[in-house]
Swiss-Prot record:
GO molecular function: cAMP binding; cAMP-dependent protein kinase inhibitor activity; protein kinase A catalytic subunit binding
Upper lineage: Eukaryota, Metazoa, Echinodermata, Eleutherozoa, Echinozoa
Modified residues (Phosphoserine): S81
Protein name in the entry: cAMP-dependent protein kinase type II regulatory subunit
SUPFAM superfamilies in UniProt: cAMP-binding domain-like (SSF51206), Dimerization-anchoring domain of cAMP-dependent PK regulatory subunit (SSF47391)
Family: Belongs to the cAMP-dependent kinase regulatory chain family.
Name of a matching Pfam family: RIIa
Length: 369
């Protein structure tokens, strides 16, 4: 049986998949319903169609009205968006873009650093890249009634709230609010879609804005680079061979880099489990204390782990304290936190649990337990 793949289906599904991986919704059906409803609203507001089409026979007549229905005017809409070509961070090789630096006082930098520290989008950035973000952001003061962004407009900036209260409107209906924290405006910059909502100030406030070019150059490009590095790392981990590419990509997004110097203790025997570690670069030394030793603090080296190997999963699987200490021999490790470990590694659990038996055999061989 032959099936015709309609034009636009691949792009549509790819965009939806990216949105799912980014948002990680708990209810996929509800998210899909909201996503495609919003997409339909944007298409109507643009007076066009974004969807899938089958190639009709030459003699077929179309019964689709070419004129879009007239829509009620939106009191928030100032101008309709004509979206630019989608930004592909993987294809961006421009290294000549001038970096923007807006002067800031020490007090302003401290406030901005506090405002951005918990923003998920910035999690993949290292310290130097975060300083680039802070340098490139500029202050924008608002008063009650100011519209920061309007539904249907082009995306120009990404905003982080320093202080103030802001209402969120979709199709003239208030759907939420921000108070003294939060961020908004990234979706229009990431996907080249019109603004999906209107944000209006209800009090005096201060925002920090990052322009479209800087947002893409610093945030999206570096996030894509980091994801690519992590995906290549995870491909070398044997237990992840069975994962689908999208599962590995989801896992890569959950990794956070931590850097350790030679001799640093990464995890200590007896501590609670905080995550599962994957070695991005360098080496790690595994050491254990024996209850039978005359010196209870004496440790015995049991293994050396290299790039692509992992450790720390046994304490997560057994809910027991760390069974060994791990020390950095060289530099960098990746951490997958406990919540992400449990959420994302279901397909790998059986493989990991088999390591428990191996670990018990190794402990018995080394210490006679």
């Amino acid at each position: 049986m032959n099936f015709e793949i309609p034009e636009g289906l691949t792009d549509l599904l790819q965009d939806f998949t990216v949105a799912v991986l980014r948002e990680k919704p708990s209810d996929l059906v509800e998210f899909a319903s909201s996503y495609f409803a919003k997409l339909q609203e944007n298409n109507i507001s643009l007076g066009g169609k974004r969807g899938v089409t089958f190639t009709a026979p030459e003699d077929a007549e179309s019964d689709i009205d070419d004129e879009p229905p007239e829509l009620p005017k939106n009191r928030y809409a100032r101008r309709k968006s004509v979206c630019a070509e989608k930004y592909d961070p993987e294809a961006d090789n421009d290294t000549d873009t001038q970096k923007l630096v807006y002067p800031k006082s020490d007090e302003q930098r401290a406030r901005l650093t506090e405002a951005v520290k918990n923003i998920l989008l910035f999690r993949a950035l290292d310290e130097k890249q975060m300083q680039e973000v802070i340098d490139a952001m500029f202050e924008k003061k608002t008063t009650p009634g100011d519209h920061v962004i309007d539904q249907g407009d082009d995306g120009d900036n990404f905003y982080v709230i320093d202080r103030g209260e802001y209402d969120i409107f979709v199709n003239d209906n208030k759907v939420g609010a921000y108070k003294d924290s939060g961020s908004f405006g990234e979706l229009a910059l990431m996907y080249n879609t019109p603004r999906a909502a209107t944000i209006a100030a209800t009090t005096d406030g201060i925002l920090w804005a990052l322009d479209r070019v800087s947002f893409r150059r610093i945030v999206l490009k570096n996030a894509a680079k980091k994801r690519r590095i992590y995906e290549e790392l995870l491909e070398k981990v044997s237990i992840f061979k069975s994962l689908e590419p999208y599962e590995r990509m989801n896992l890569a997004d959950a990794l956070v880099t931590r850097t350790y110097e030679d001799g640093d203790c990464i995890i200590a025997q007896g501590d609670g489990a905080d995550g599962c570690y994957f070695i991005e670069a360098g080496q790690c030394r595994i050491a254990m204390k024996s209850e039978r030793s005359d010196n209870p603090d004496e440790e015995k080296e049991v293994a050396i782990y290299n790039q692509g190997q992992y450790f720390g999963e046994l304490a997560l699987l057994t809910n027991k304290p760390r069974a060994a200490s791990v020390y950095a021999v060289e530099d960098v490790d990746c951490l997958l936190d406990v919540n992400a470990f449990e959420r994302l590694l279901g397909p790998c659990m059986d493989i990991m649990k088999r390591n428990i038996e191996h670990y018990e055999q190794e402990t018995s061989r080394l210490f006679g337990k």
